[in-house]
Amino acid sequence: MCGVRVVARVAAALLVIVAAAPATADARFKRCRSDATIRCGTVTVPLDRTGRVPGSVRLYAEQVPAEDQPPGGGAGRLVGRRAAPRGAIFALAGGPGQPATQFTSDFLFAFGDQAAGRDIVTFDQRGTGRSDLLRCPEVEKVALLSRYPESGQKCAERLGDRRGLYTTSDSVDDMEAVRRAIGVDRIAIYGASYGTKVALEYARRYPDHVERLILDSVVTPDGPDPLYRDTFNASPRVERASCGPECGFTSDAGEDLVAFARQLGDAPARGFVVDRRGRRLAQSLGSTRLLFLLLAGDFAPRIRAALPAAIYSARRGDPAQLLRVASLSEQSAEPADPRDFSTAVFAATICEEAPQPWRRDAAFDDRARQTDETLARYGDDAFTPLGPAAAAQSDLVQLCRRWTEASPGPPSVRPPLPDVPALILEGELDLRTPLEGAQRVAAQLPRSTLVTVPATGHSTLGSDGSACTLRAISRFLARESVLSKCANPSKILPPEHPAPLSLTEVAPFKGAPRSIARVLQAVDLTLNDLEDQAASQAVLSFDAGDNRSVAGGGLRGGRFRVGTSGMSIDRAVYAPGVRVSGRLLNRAGRIGIFRVAGSPAVSGVVEYRGGGVITGRLGGRRFRVRLRRVDTTPPDIELGRLARPVGAVPGVR
């Protein structure tokens, strides 16, 4: 759906508040964009509400008055229900660290008719976007925060006393200030990822102003867990679900992950990745890198589809596919533009309030020992299948390892959550905020409905390829019953298959002469693989603003480059012993001539003539066959993008 694709830009880090009381515009809100429907203004709040640290924060906000909103679109169109009372829709960004005003138009489009009669208001949380942007060059310059723990220490030193003033509690107080400035009373809150933590805390603190809660990819009230215990324990289940019924190469993808992780406990997987110049670069993969790769699949169906086969192959000693998909996912892990994501706010919020495996007053040199003691106290089963060593090296632990806390931290005992109607939306394949955590939160909310969205990862509003999430939200806001199961769920992207270890493992090409059937199939598999890699590289180049041509390496050797006329291929190897070179033309269907090299029995020429016709000579024998290819990609699949494994934490990039 078009609306789902637009919402995907939000990347699961947003908090929306739907108010049921009449809204009054603040006099400071003026038209401020080329889009005349959007108005902007500011709400000034204290930097430190205790007065200990002087200063203030100007919260930048945008407002789309109900009377200026175009009709039609969004979730409301899906369910023809009565119009809701006039009110306001507020949007808070999560992350923590992402500004919300860049998504004002996206929310207007996504909620469509459901916003009829309500103003839409977004604002940048303190320290993000245009709300007095918080900067820490030390953490802005690195993509994988876990590799540079000293960056967290330098950021804390730069921020000084301010570092303790960007907590969830501060965000809740800011949210209340904006609610008062806009002039609404009771509000329904939609939150995604970290936004659910803000939503739950706001509901706990200001229950009289909360009409209902919508929690999408919920972070537990005491989370996020720097040790990723829920993520670890849920990963075998998610691998099984990602594989679906089409993984004929394995009987249990979850057990493959468990067994492979056990192997990594003895030694990392070692192999090579072929770069865009055709060079073979040595790489290794341990349990921590595997953790970030699993998390990268939350926003990237292609990664999820690749992982079961890649893990299966790595388990039997061939890590080529796994190392390549890990390398591709990390290529997108570029440092974020601070205007789009404040890594300083992220560090300040997480390091001040996440429950670290050491005492808050622990000396830096003693934190490693206390971490080991905490891991031992939890026991190995708490970290199945990746193991406690991966937990100790997580991004959230390493980022905060040398951070001196400036705030007292969250209370150890919190009041119960309020008794308000709640809709909890959870992706079946979500590893950042797994289903198991959502179930615990649902048990604390007496009037909650938990909807598990199949074939969907983190942030159901942004990644659900069906209408399930939008329908559930629409019905819930209309005070109608919501089914706990999706009527027409998305289908998973068909899983990839393990790459052959030898030509004898390649299935014969149907209809081809027996003597060349495996070779011809190997050529076809090579072209399939290169086309898939070109598509992934194109996404990476677009996201990075890279104007270079799309290029990459073959799985086991060679390289490819995509130009205006098509793809040039130089000695690409997918099946061992079969090298493919030539040009795949940029035309409808597969058309091109390819030289095949290897032993005399496999060498020759293969020509794809279009219309599924393949001719040529292999091993001295002429042939002519017709390709019978079936595209098994469901038409409603949202392919998404390669997710950034940086800060693999709820709601972050």
Positions of predicted regions on the chain:
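Secretory targeting and sorting signals
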Residues: 2-25, 43, 175
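Gly/Pro-rich cap/lid or specificity-loop segments adjacent to the active site
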Residues: 26-289, 354-653
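Alpha/beta-hydrolase-fold enzymes
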Residues: 243-350, 354-355
